[in-house]
C-alpha cells in the first residue's frame, strides 16, 4: 500500500508540474513542410488565438543546437505568417518538403523548434557546422548563439544587431520585388499584404500593376479557393503558332502538377467542355510547360495578350485537373482616359513605362499567371517577337545563318504537324555531312544548346534514328572545347543514313526525341528549299 501511495503522489506531482508548464495556454504546434512553406510559414489559427489573436512583430526561433534566428511575423488575409528571416532558418537547417517542425513556446517571443525528417524521426545536426553560420550570413540574418556566452551583454548586443539586420532586409525586400531567392515570386514578395501559400503564386520576374493586383485579389476572394492559385498573364509566346505554350513554375508544379510528363485536364467554370494539354516536365528541373492541346484552349477561349488566367487545382481528384478563370484585358484607343488602367505584365521595371493601356472586364472566370524565362533565345533558335523571350522555343536550329522566310514557314509548318512535347532539333546538311562527295567526312553537328539540354554528354553513345519505318544506329560523339564547352556530332553510321535517305546539301533534318533511356529520335526530312520557287 505504501508503494501505491508513493506512486500516486509521484503521478499527482507530474500532473501538477505539467499543468504549471501549460499555464492555461497552448504551448506547442506542429507544421509539415510543403513547397509553399519554404518561403513563409502559416501559424495555426487556434494557436494564435491563445495569445489574444496577436503575435509580436518578431519572434526568436531556437534551433536544436541553441542558435537563435529572428523572424518577422506578419498578418495577411487574416492569417499569421512567419516571413522575413524564415527562409534563412529553413536554408540553414536544410529543411525539405515533407519534413515536420514542432514549435514549442518557451517564453515571451521565443520558440524552441524540433525538426523531424520525413520518417518522423528527429534530425541530428552538427553544432560546429551550424554555429559557423555561413549559410545564414549569406542571407544577411546572423545567428545568435545562446548555448553559452562569457558575457550576457555581448549576447544582448548581438541580438540587437540581429534585429537591425532583419529590419533592413525586410525593408529592402518590400521596396523591390526583384531577385527573389526562391526562383519565382509569391505575390507578397512584391506586395507584403498578399500572403504566400494562402493566396496565389506568380512566375519568376512577373509584376502586376496595382489595377491587376486589385482585380486578381478581388476575384480570388470571390471564388475563395482552398488551394493556392497559379496566375499567368498571356503573352505572344503563350498564344501564337506554330506551338504556343505556357510555362509553369517548377516549385508550384512540384506540388500541384504530375511528377513526370503527363496529360492534364483544363476546364472553365460552369462549362462542360474540357481540354487535355500535355504537361511537359523538363529534365533539368527548371520551369515546366503546357503544350499540345494548350493551343486548342487558347483558340476556343479567344485568349488575347494581357488576358489573365487563374489556375485553380481541383481538390481531391485522382487526375490532375484545373479550373481556369479568365480576366480579359481589352485594348482600348479611348483618349479621354475613362476607366483606363495600365496593367503591363513586364518582366522588369524599365519596361513598365511601355505597359499597354487596357480596359479589364471580368469573364465568367478569373485567371492569373505569368511566365518569364531566364533562358534567352539566341540566333540558333526560332526567333520570337516577344521581348521577354520564351523559356523554350518550338525548335532549336544549329544553323549560323538565319532562315529565309520560305525556310522559316516550311519548318514551322512541319514542327506544328509533329506536335512534339519538347523542342525539335533542326539541322541542315552541309558538304561534310551529306551522302555525296569525297571530301573529309566530319559527320553532322547538332545544336549544342539543344544537345546540352536533351542529349547525354557522355562520349560514344549509341543513338537510334528512325525514318520512314526504318532504323539506323548512329554513334553520338561529344567533343570538348576548352573555351566554348562541348560539341555533339553524329559520326559512325550517319553516312549510311544520309545515303539511304538520299540527303543532299541544303536538306533539312528535324530530330524529334522519342525515348531517353534507349536514346531514340525520329528524323523528319525537308528537301532543299532552294530547288523550289517561293510561291504560294
Curated annotation (Swiss-Prot):
Residues 138-199, 335-396 are annotated as: Disordered. GO terms for molecular function: DNA binding. Its main location: nucleus. The keyword Transcription applies. One of its GO terms (cellular component) is nucleus. Residues 344-355 have a biased composition (Polar residues). Residues 26-119, 231-330, 429-529 bind DNA. Residues 145-160, 171-183 have a biased composition (Low complexity). It holds the Pfam family B3. This is B3 domain-containing protein Os03g0619800.
